[in-house]
Swiss-Prot record:
It comes from the Bacteria. One of its GO terms (cellular component) is plasma membrane. The lineage of its organism: Bacteria, Bacillati, Bacillota, Bacilli, Lactobacillales. Keywords: Cell membrane, Ion channel, Ion transport, Membrane, Transmembrane, Transmembrane helix, Transport. It is a multi-pass membrane protein. Homopentamer. Pfam families: MscL (PF01741). PANTHER family: LARGE-CONDUCTANCE MECHANOSENSITIVE CHANNEL (PTHR30266:SF2), MECHANOSENSITIVE CHANNEL MSCL (PTHR30266). The keyword Cell membrane applies. The chain crosses the membrane at residues 14-34, 67-87. This is Large-conductance mechanosensitive channel. It comes from Lactococcus lactis subsp. cremoris (strain MG1363). The gene is mscL. It is found in: Cell membrane. Channel that opens in response to stretch forces in the membrane lipid bilayer. May participate in the regulation of osmotic pressure changes within the cell.
Amino acid sequence: MLKEFKNFILRGNVLDLAVGVIIGAAFTALVKSLVDNLINPLIGMFVQSSALAHLSVTVGKTKFTYGAFLNDVINFVITAFVIFVLIKFINKLFPKKEEIVEEQKNEELETLQEIRDLLKK
């Protein structure tokens, strides 16, 4: 049982996932710092509140802190955009095997078509 567990842990997918989770947590802290320390003060220059997270509206006795929600939306959009760019970059570096095979087939097809055209002459 320990041997099976060792094989499971040492498989590439599990290690890749663990590294991804650790890097993701560190990246989330970095994005939060970017939003809290750079983006929020810039927005604070244009609104009355110095911190975006403290923006709110009160209706009756209920207080709606929409600033905290906006803060989370900014964090999400930045994180999603950076992940999107990273995935596009990684996909360019490591094309899928299917894409490589398809490119080879296209080259073979072009070569065969050229040979056919030459034989027609």
